[in-house]
Structure formats: C-alpha cells, structure tokens
Design a protein with these regions (language model features):
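Short beta-strand edge/turn micro-motifs at domain boundaries
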Residues: 127-131, 146, 269-270, 357-359
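Extended, solvent-exposed, non-transmembrane regions
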Residues: 13-77, 86-123, 139, 146
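Bacterial Sec-dependent N-terminal signal peptides
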Residues: 1-26, 107-128, 132, 403-420
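N-terminal glycine/threonine-rich, aromatic-flanked beta-hairpin/loop signature
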Residues: 37-72, 142-293
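Broad, structure-driven detector of short, well-ordered beta-strand segments within folded domains
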Residues: 44-48, 99-104, 194-207, 344-348, ...
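Short, solvent-exposed coil/turn segments at beta-strand boundaries
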Residues: 50-55, 79-82, 101-110, 201-210, ...
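Hydrophilic extracytoplasmic domains
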Residues: 235-236, 244-256, 262-264, 271, ...
C-alpha cells in the first residue's frame, strides 16, 4: 500500500496511540465501527503509531473466527486533526479477506471493514431453502413378529429427502432397530415442524447468518401426531396445509456468524447481542450494570459467572429460555456455554443438488448427552394443550439420547437446497 499523501504531519503519535472501544462497559465509547456498512458494537481495536508515518492495528473478535488480527506497516496520511489510512487484510485462522478504511483523531477511531469474503465463501455462501419431502424405496431394518431377528429389507414409502437429515450406521440388532426408530421419528417430527418456523437460511459471504422465520403459532401439532411419527413416515401432504398461510420475516444480522476452520463450517452465536436484545425488548426495567457484567463475563468465557448473572437478570425478565438455561446443572450449563461461545463444528457435503449441513458423532455427542436436560425448554415451546406432557417428553428425550449415543457413526442436521 502507498500513502496518497507524502506529508506525514499530524497529531503527536502518543495522542492517538490507544485502545479504542465501543463496548457497553466503556462509559466513554471512542470507536465507531462498521462491518459491511452495518454498525458493530461491543468491540475494541488497538491503534498505535510511533512516527506518524505507519501504524499497527489489532482487530479483536471482529472477523468471525478470528480472536485477533494484527495488521502492520499501514501507511498513514496525516493532517492537522488526525490520520487516515486504508488497505487490505486477511484472517490468520479462517483465510477471510477484507478491506479496511479508517481515520483516527485524538480520542476517536472510525473504522469500516468491507469487501469481506469468508474462507470457503465461494463454496458455502448462499441462501438455502428447505426441500420438499420425497418418499420412496429405502432399505431399513425390519424385525420378525417376536422381535428376535432383524433383517435389512427394501420398503416403499420411506422418507428419502426432508429438511431434517439423519443417518446412522447400525447393525441388524434390537439396538440398531431402536436407533433407527428414534432417528426416523426425530427426522419426521423436525421435518414436520421446521417448515412452520423457517423458510430459508442465508450464509452471507461476510460471515453473517440470517434467516426468514415465522413466529406464528404452530399448527397441526398434537401428541397423536408427534408419537405417530415413530411408526408412520412423513409426507409433504402432511406439511403443506400448515404452511400455506404462514408469514415469514427476515431475521436481523449480528445474532449468528459462520466461518470455516479445518474444512468444517463453524456456526457461532453472538450471546452478547442475543442477551442485549432480550433485555432491550422487555418492558421490564433492566439494571444496565447487570447487562454489562454479563457481556464482560461472556467475553472472558466465565461460564459460572454468566449463569449467576443470568439468574439475577431473569428474576426481572422471567424469560422462558433464560429460565431453562439457569436451571440446568452446572456441568450441562458449562457444556452449552462452551459449545455456543466457541462455535458449533458442522460438516458440509453436497449431493444431487442438495446441501447437507450436519453434526457428526463427535459434534453431536455433547448434544445427545444434554437432551434429557432439555425437557423443560421443549415443553415450554409446545402448545398450551400439551403443557402437561412433561413426563412423556422427558422419557422421549432420554430414549433419543441413549439411541443416538450407541452407533459408531451418526450424522444429524439439515438437508437444504441452495438457491443457485
């Protein structure tokens, strides 16, 4: 990069060398940061210059998957008020490329990150829709009348394609048949409900994850339907009436991001933004100090401190999701927290025009172990006439947990259709 101005005069370097932050915990935010034109808060940037001719900038947790990116030897163009600069950069861990443009004056840094292209964006960045259910002949385990012997048989009417993807390598045994039954049942149930909640998912080239979703009440969900899916395969005709009149709205940016690492797609939730959104959307007065402390604890990866503060916060909010989180045991909370804050590692494969984004056995095992603890959250999401089914739901989740932990190979996630 070459500076467009060879005159290097400007403020004294010591006056602009500082850490600039717009974190909520900073009482005097001095960083104006935009990410592809959208304001980005809760971040910090180091800026330093010794001579006023070149600078070093360190970006902290701004690019998805990059804890810190240090850019050196940045040419500065100075004037009486400050220094301007621009250039191109690349992530150390994710191979993300980007452009940066900024200006620093005494007490203020303005920085725009643009032209962001995540590593593997050419392969994965796209808008994905849910597929229609396709039924046909599939080889499945079938038991004899007494359940003493199981054989592989080709059976018509089975689910070949659906929005929930499930595959497990099982043996022709009672255990294998149990895993198959639970797996097919969950695939049916999730694929039945998911189209009512989700229309499409977008993995942006800039790392943002957004979706078109519906918050209308669920239709056609009752106990007979749910348990019927353990025996009866799902069909598209069961789904279509429930989604015909649903309205879908776009989700905001900033709640989830993606990046690639070691060939896997890592999905990461922005807990700080999510917690701030829950608090700001509540009509109840929130102590800003608690919100700030939670966000700081999240950034410091202090799971138990986060749980303690969320417990205090939810005494005012009475939010069902937060209530579930703070009531799980410490071991489960630690697992959930670490999983969400470090990112969810997912495999991506493509076949016959469909894209499969899923967890393998290693990625899914922590979730399978947590399933029994999810019962209160699942029950809270069910229609009012199903709220008394806590015991049955608990039994259901325990069965799934045991069945999904037994196979050597298991794949569980989404089957999607890319727009292009």
């Amino acid at each position: 990069l070459i500076s467009c101005d060879e005159d290097h005069y400007g403020p004294a370097p010591v006056d602009v060398t500082a850490n600039y932050s717009n974190k909520i915990s900073n009482p005097n935010p001095n960083l104006v940061l935009t990410y592809n034109g959208d304001a980005m808060n809760g971040k910090s940037v180091d800026f330093s210059t010794v001579t006023g001719e070149t600078a070093i900038i360190t970006l902290y947790d701004i690019l998805p998957g990059e804890k810190a990116i240090k850019i050196t030897s940045i040419p500065l163009s100075g004037d009486t008020e400050g220094y301007s600069f621009s250039g191109n950069g690349m992530g150390n861990e994710t191979l993300t490329t980007f452009r940066y443009e900024g200006r620093v004056t005494k007490g203020k840094l303005t920085l725009n990150i643009s032209n962001i292209q995540m590593g593997n964006a050419d392969l994965w960045a796209n808008t994905y829709k849910l597929p229609e259910v396709v039924n046909g002949v599939k080889k499945i385990l079938v038991g004899d009348t007494w359940g003493n012997e199981y054989t592989w048989q080709e059976v018509d009417g089975q689910v070949l394609n659906a929005s929930c993807y499930f595959h497990a390598d099982v043996e022709a045994t009672e255990s294998g048949a149990t895993t198959q039954t639970w797996g097919n049942g969950i695939q049916n149930i999730v694929s039945y409900i998911l189209p009512q909640v989700l229309q499409d998912i977008t993995l942006g080239a800039d790392g943002n994850v957004t979706a078109s979703y519906s918050n209308d009440p669920l239709s056609g969900v009752d106990i007979d339907v749910i348990f019927g899916f353990l025996e009866t395969p799902l069909t598209q005709e069961m789904i279509t009436p429930n989604i015909a009149d649903r309205k879908y709205i776009p989700s905001p940016k900033g709640f989830a991001t993606w990046f690639q690492k070691d060939g896997k797609l890592i999905l990461k939730l922005n807990l700080a933004n999510i917690i701030s959104s829950i608090a700001s959307s509540s009509d109840t007065y929130m102590d800003v100090n608690i919100i700030n402390a939670i966000i700081d604890a999240v950034s410091q990866m202090d799971a138990m401190k986060v749980k303690e503060l969320l417990t205090t916060l939810n005494q005012s909010l009475n939010n069902e999701t937060l209530g579930f989180l703070v009531n799980v045991n410490d071991t489960s909370f630690n697992a959930i927290f670490n999983w969400l804050t470090t990112g969810i590692p997912m495999q991506v494969t493509s076949k016959e025009g469909h894209t499969y984004i899923y967890l393998d056995k290693e990625g899914f095992t922590p979730i399978a172990k947590l399933l029994p603890d999810l019962s209160p959250l699942i029950v809270s999401m069910l229609p009012e006439d199903m709220q008394g089914l806590g015991f049955i739901i608990s039994t259901f989740l325990n069965g799934i947990s045991e069945a999904f932990l037994s196979p050597e190979k298991i794949e569980f996630g989404l089957e999607l259709v890319p727009n292009k």
